[in-house]
Amino acid sequence: MASAVVNQSEAAAVRAPSKPVKTYSKENEQLVKQSWEILKKDAQRNGINFFRKVFEIAPGAKAMYSFLRDSTIPFEENPKVKNHARYVFMMTGDAAVQLGEKGAYQVLESKLQKLAATHVNAGVTDDQFEIVKEAILYAIEMGVPDLWSPELKSAWGDAYDMLAEQVKAEMHAQRSAATS
């Protein structure tokens, strides 16, 4: 994988300015934080729900995960799926709760280049981020059904959009650097 990763200084040199940042209100911040306190207690189950929904919407996405391609282990029993699902769900939630304090770029900065490179190498496209958004909102709804509301959906949707825009911008920068 290291050979496929773009020289980071080249990517930084061509990084396009990100789109205008959505406003992340105090109300949204509170809704996300309140629900995250509950969601993170069962991050593995919520992460499994998230990935189950991704693969329901886009069954071909399984091919992007080396640990699923040739596995005969049932999805929900696969220890690699469990670990990855928990990691992705925790990273997304932990980043979302920090948005009000730091902004999307600062929240992701330390992980952004590696995260983008992983997605570039897997062949992820911008439109696939919408599938992930639908799946993460589904997992949150399943994880906190008593709190779920249009306002909570909007708060998490805005948080996801802000984070996804930063990842996509870095992916574009890395792809541009690789072709120049």
UniProtKB/Swiss-Prot annotation:
Pfam families: Globin (PF00042)
Root EC class: oxidoreductase
Cofactor note as given: Binds 1 heme group per subunit.
Molecular function GO terms recorded: heme binding; metal ion binding; oxidoreductase activity; oxygen binding; oxygen carrier activity
EC assignment: 1.7.2.-
Compartments it resides in: Cytoplasm; Nucleus
Transmembrane segments: none
Keywords: Cytoplasm, Heme, Iron, Metal-binding, Nucleus, Oxidoreductase, Oxygen transport, Transport
Gene Ontology cellular component annotations, sorted alphabetically: cytoplasm; nucleus
Feature type site, description Homodimerization: K153
Catalytic activity: Fe(III)-heme b-[protein] + nitric oxide + H2O = Fe(II)-heme b-[protein] + nitrite + 2 H(+)
Motif (Homodimerization): 56-60, 126-138
InterPro entries membership: Globin (IPR000971), Globin-like_sf (IPR009050), Globin/Proto (IPR012292), Leghaemoglobin-like (IPR001032), Leghaemoglobin_Fe_BS (IPR019824)
Keyword Signal: no
Annotated ranges, domain Globin: 23-172
Binding of heme b, residues: S66, K80, H84, K114, T118, H119
The protein's required cofactors: heme b
PANTHER family membership: LEGHEMOGLOBIN-RELATED, NON-SYMBIOTIC HEMOGLOBIN 3
Family, as annotated: Belongs to the plant globin family.
Subunit structure and binding partners: Homodimer.
Function: Phytoglobin that reduces nitrite to nitric oxide (NO) under anoxic conditions (e.g. during flooding or in waterlogged soil). May not function as an oxygen storage or transport protein. Has an unusually high affinity for O(2) through an hexacoordinate heme iron because of a very low dissociation constant.
Protein name listed in UniProt: Anaerobic nitrite reductase GLB0
Organism for this UniProt entry: Physcomitrium patens (Spreading-leaved earth moss)
